[in-house]
UniProtKB/Swiss-Prot annotation:
Keyword tags: ATP synthesis, ATP-binding, Cell inner membrane, Cell membrane, CF(1), Hydrogen ion transport, Ion transport, Membrane, Nucleotide-binding, Translocase, Transport
Superkingdom of this protein's organism: Bacteria
Catalysed reactions, semicolon-separated: ATP + H2O + 4 H(+)(in) = ADP + phosphate + 5 H(+)(out)
Major subcellular site: membrane
Family statement: Belongs to the ATPase alpha/beta chains family.
Name this polypeptide is given: ATP synthase subunit alpha
GO cellular component, one term: plasma membrane
Enzyme's top EC category: translocase
Lineage, uppermost ranks: Bacteria, Pseudomonadati, Campylobacterota, Epsilonproteobacteria, Campylobacterales
Gene3D superfamilies: 2.40.30.20, ATP synthase alpha/beta chain, C-terminal domain, P-loop containing nucleotide triphosphate hydrolases
Record's keyword annotation contains Ion transport: yes
Gene that specifies this protein: atpA
Listed PROSITE patterns: ATPASE_ALPHA_BETA
CDD domains to which the protein is assigned, alphabetical: ATP-synt_F1_alpha_C, ATP-synt_F1_alpha_N, F1-ATPase_alpha_CD
């Protein structure tokens, strides 16, 4: 028996086929390279491309559209330029640059695109984020109130940093800027802070040394290193800080705390200037393009302390700027000083005279960190800045006047001892309770009758003595975070007992 063919069934099938017929064609917009030089390709034919959009060249190299002109597009090449020649085809990828984020990156060294460069295998990241993100608004933020201890006495006592702050480290070359940053990373051990170190335009050997130092102190367990070396293209150096801050924002947005160090933003500005001049953008002051302020402001504004509703996470930024012969009034230094919440100024004169870290306490300031400083540190360092300022004034005066009155001489001597107290060898950050004890000893006159040369020995022997005989002092400061009358009395007793046993020899 032959099956009956129903006309309405056939028409229903035909209708369904017509409705489901997909006429869309996957159109790929392609262009041709007109010229290529210095890591920038001029491309003709990509009429609908967006600013910041990713493209792919014939050999698989990626690029990013930065200049949109009437007849051509200026594309910076994110990789090797050797395979790209005049006439090479370029296709739009219709997406913006994203980098991997998350815990999988911790302990790794990556490039500006988040690709591993440490020969430890691929990174199994489950999430990616846009490199360019808008900074959080006012309502999403909370004022800085938790301390971020650097472990450096001069900073934690006089220029305190809070979680979510932007504090600039500024100084000439070879004044210990990177050392301050590495000390801060080492001091975050056990503090549940993820650190991101962004190296921009540095020698590969220097970055390798930093990574080795971090591994030596076990700091790579909670650190990500983003490296765009001196041999990398200007485009990769330009992208490195944005890639780093994107990785840091992931932790901040997940109710965690992160610290990011940009080493350094002077080289970042130079890379951006190089890229802009090749793209034929009009130069301004010091040949930097007009939007160089925006380059750094949009980067540093992404560091913040989030409010409780958003999880109370934080991202603290420590940008580094290199000055020429101590000139802080140059274009880039003044820009970054005005964007940040304070600066730590390192001086080559202090460094050369043996005061290390070479922090100029008079020029260094923290505009918001005071609220984050623990009460015990506030109590002992309240007059320290003023005392040091008076000491410097007296020191300048004493060079010309031989006969000083008794009180001036005492003030000069105590100032000298306090300068010694604030000295610290590199890669040896101090817990906050130890800092409180030694600054207390100096400010209460326990070092007055000890020679300046013996202060370091006094300090080195004091901590183990208190740990052995009066462990409750450290414990109380650590937990209570305040010097009450009881601890003060105990501290006086401990210092008197220690002085009785201390010998200079």
């Amino acid at each position: 028996m032959s099956a009956k063919i129903k006309a309405d069934e056939i028409s229903a099938i035909i209708k369904e086929r017509i409705e489901n017929f997909d006429l869309s064609v996957d159109v790929e917009e392609t262009g041709k390279v007109i010229s290529v030089a210095d890591g920038v390709a001029n491309v003709y034919g990509l009429k609908n491309i967006m600013a910041g959009e990713m493209v792919e060249f014939e050999g698989g190299e990626k690029g990013m559209a930065l200049n949109l002109e009437e007849s051509s597009v200026g594309i910076v090449i994110l990789g090797k330029t050797s395979g790209i020649t005049e006439g090479s085809s370029v296709k739009r990828l219709k997406k913006l640059l994203r980098v991997p984020v998350g815990d999988a990156l911790i302990g790794r060294v990556v490039n500006s695109l988040g690709e591993p460069i440490d020969a430890k295998g691929p990174i199994e990241a489950t999430e990616t984020r846009f490199v360019e993100e808008k900074a959080k608004g006012i309502m999403a933020r909370k004022s800085v109130h938790e301390p971020l201890q650097t472990g450096i006495k001069a900073i934690d006592a006089l220029v305190p940093i809070g979680r979510g702050q932007r504090e600039l480290i500024i100084g000439d070359r070879q004044t210990g800027k990177t050392t301050v940053a590495i000390d801060t990373i080492i001091n975050q051990k056990g503090q549940d802070v993820i650190c991101i170190y962004v190296a921009i335009g540095q020698k590969q050997s220097t970055v390798a040394q930093v990574v080795k130092k971090l591994e030596e102190y076990g700091a790579m367990d909670y650190t990500i290193v983003v490296n765009a070396g001196a041999s990398d293209t200007a485009a990769l150096q330009y992208l490195a800080p944005y890639a780093g801050v994107t990785m840091g924002e992931y932790f901040r947005d997940n109710s965690r705390h992160a610290l990011i160090i940009y080493d350094d933003l002077s080289k970042h500005a130079v890379a951006y200037r190089e890229m802009s001049l090749i793209l034929r953008r009009p130069p301004g002051r010091e040949a930097y393009p007009g939007d160089v302020f925006y380059l750094h402001s949009r980067l540093l504004e992404r560091a913040s302390k989030l409010n409780d509703a958003l999880g109370a996470g934080s991202l603290t930024a420590l940008p580094i700027i290199e000055t020429q012969a101590g000139d802080v009034s140059a274009y880039i230094p003044t820009n970054v000083i005005s964007i940040t919440d304070g600066q730590i100024f390192l001086e080559s004169d202090l460094f050369n005279s043996g005061i290390r870290p070479a922090i100029n306490v008079g020029l260094s300031v923290s505009r918001v960190g005071g609220a984050a400083q623990i009460k015990a540190t506030k109590q002992v360092s309240g007059n320290l800045r003023l005392d040091l300022a008076q000491y410097r004034e007296l020191q300048a005066f004493a060079q010309f006047a031989s006969d000083l009155d008794e009180s001036s001489r005492k003030q000069l001597e105590r100032g000298q001892k306090m300068v010694e107290v604030l000295k610290q060898p590199p890669y040896s950050p101090l817990p906050v309770e130890n800092q409180v004890v030694i600054i207390f000893a100096g400010s209460k006159g326990y070092l007055d009758d000890i020679a300046a040369a013996s202060v370091t020995k006094f300090e080195a022997e004091l901590y183990p003595y208190i740990e052995a005989k009066y462990p409750e002092i450290f414990e109380q400061i650590r937990t209570k975070k305040v010097l009450d009358k009881e601890i003060e009395e105990l501290l006086h007793k401990a210092l008197k007992d220690f002085k009785a046993t201390f010998s200079v020899a």
